[in-house]
Structures are given as structure tokens and as C-alpha cells.
């Protein structure tokens, strides 16, 4: 292991932040920076009429990844 959070782990973590009973039909991810083992991820959720955005951020509020679920 290279001690990085991999893409599948990011998606799994973002999925845990979805509202209950949310059905995913489509997913799109924008990877912004690498997260390493031991980094703290701060999730933010924004719901729209078309879906839900989850941003997993560092301690300064900068995103590691932004995931759009529809």
C-alpha cells in the first residue's frame, strides 16, 4: 500500500453521507487532491432537486473529492 486513500474508498465514504432512502442512479466524482492514511476527512452535503453533492474536505476546507450522486 502507498498509504493513500484510493478512489473506491472515497466513493464508499461519500456514499455513507447520503440521506437515508436515497437511490443512486448515477455518480460522478472530481478528485482534487490526495488523502493519506491518517488524514481527517470532513464531509459536507448539499442537496439539490436533481441529486446530492458530497464534498470530503481537509481541515482547511479544501476538497479531496467532490462526488455528485443522482
Locate each region found by the language model.
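Hot-dog-fold acyl-thioester-processing enzymes
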Residues: 1-25
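Surface-exposed beta-strand edges and their flanking turn/coil or helix-capping segments
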Residues: 4-8, 42-44, 69
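Broad hydrophobic/π-residue packing in well-ordered secondary structure
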Residues: 9-13, 31, 44-46, 52-55
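A signal for specific C-terminal beta-sheet/loop modules enriched in small/flexible residues
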Residues: 14-23, 32-33, 62-70
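Active-site beta-strand->loop segment that positions catalytic residues and contacts the acyl thioester
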Residues: 26-46
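HotDog/MaoC-like acyl-thioester-processing domains
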Residues: 36-37, 46-70
Amino acid at each position: 500500500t502507498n498509504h493513500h486513500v484510493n478512489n473506491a474508498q472515497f466513493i464508499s465514504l461519500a456514499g455513507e453521507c447520503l440521506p437515508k432512502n436515497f437511490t443512486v442512479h448515477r455518480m460522478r466524482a472530481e478528485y482534487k487532491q490526495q488523502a493519506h492514511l491518517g488524514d481527517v476527512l470532513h464531509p459536507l452535503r448539499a442537496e439539490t432537486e436533481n441529486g446530492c453533492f458530497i464534498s470530503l474536505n481537509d481541515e482547511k476546507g479544501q476538497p479531496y473529492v467532490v462526488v455528485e450522486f443522482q
